[in-house]
Amino acid sequence: MSENLNSEKEFVQEQYKKLLNEVKEHGNVLITHIGELSQNVISVLESEVEEKVTGLELAKGPVKKIFFISVETLQNMLIHGHKGNAGEQQNFFILLKTDSCINIISANLVANDAIHTLEKQIHVINSFDDEKALKAYYLEHLESNTMSDKGGAGLGFITIAMKSANK
């Protein structure tokens, strides 16, 4: 294992531990995952999310939204997360229930040269105060058919923002 991979892995593990300790003070951790993702791991996590969230006795609408956002988040991390020289990714995912809401917390490494573009994209999405304006932005983005080098059209964050109504 390369020194860089060790440092990336250690960095993600350190951030995960800090965040997990912090969020435990504010709610009940329903699901947690740290490490690599694959379609098989995502399938297991999807089942866990479905089981945990349906057990909360929430209305069907919020359950569907939580499930959708969880799956979209996991897929985004798998597809777009930075891969080290050995092809490994460092990710984490936490599903937390507080008294007032469900939080989906995720993290993955991003290549340094992608940080500015990603920050800009998130800033634009978060700048919308109106659902209709965000939906118009989504449709405009969809019609432009701009694909990334990883095959995405940049719609994941937008759909998450639209579904959650809480950026």
Label every PLM stretch briefly.
Residues 2-10, 20-32, 44, 80-167:
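Conserved beta-strand-loop-beta-strand hairpin that lines the nucleotide-binding pocket
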Residues 11-15:
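Active-site Tyr-X1-5-Lys
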Residues 34-42:
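Short, contiguous, helix-prone interaction/anchoring segments in small proteins
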Residues 47-71, 143-150:
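Conserved short strand/loop->alpha-helix "switch" segment adjacent to the catalytic nucleotide/phosphoryl-transfer site
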